[in-house]
C-alpha cells in the first residue's frame, strides 16, 4: 500500500513537471519561430510609417516655437 502511494505521488509530480515544462518550451519555441518566420520579420517594420523624412519650414518653425 505504501509503495502504491509513493508511485502515485511520483507519477503526479512527474506529470506536473512535464505539463509545466511543455508550456514553457512551447513559449520559447513560438518566440523563436516568430523571430525567424516570415510573419515575425514582416512585423518588425511596423513603425516605418511614423517617420516622415521630409520636414517642412512650417514644421521647423513650430518646433522652434515649441522649444522656447
Curated annotation (Swiss-Prot):
Expressed by the venom gland. Residues 1-23 form the signal peptide. Its main location: secreted. The modification Leucine amide is found at residue 36. It is found in: Secreted; Target cell membrane. Keywords: Amidation, Antibiotic, Antimicrobial, Cleavage on pair of basic residues, Cytolysis, Membrane, Secreted, Signal, Target cell membrane, Target membrane. The keyword Repeat does not apply. GO terms for cellular component: extracellular region; membrane; other organism cell membrane. Residues 40-68 form a propeptide. It comes from the Eukaryota. The keyword Glycosyltransferase does not apply. Amphipathic and cationic peptide with an alpha-helical structure. Amphipathic peptide that shows no antibacterial activity even at 50 uM but shows a low hemolytic activity against human erythrocytes. Belongs to the non-disulfide-bridged peptide (NDBP) superfamily. Short antimicrobial peptide (group 4) family. This is Amphipathic peptide CT1.
Amino acid at each position: 500500500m505504501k509503495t502504491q502511494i509513493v508511485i502515485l505521488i511520483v507519477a503526479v509530480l512527474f506529470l506536473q513537471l512535464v505539463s509545466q515544462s511543455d508550456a514553457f518550451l512551447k513559449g520559447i519555441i513560438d518566440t523563436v519561430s516568430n523571430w525567424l518566420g516570415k510573419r515575425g520579420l514582416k512585423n518588425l517594420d511596423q513603425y516605418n510609417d511614423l517617420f516622415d523624412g521630409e520636414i517642412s519650414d512650417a514644421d521647423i518653425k513650430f518646433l522652434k516655437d515649441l522649444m522656447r
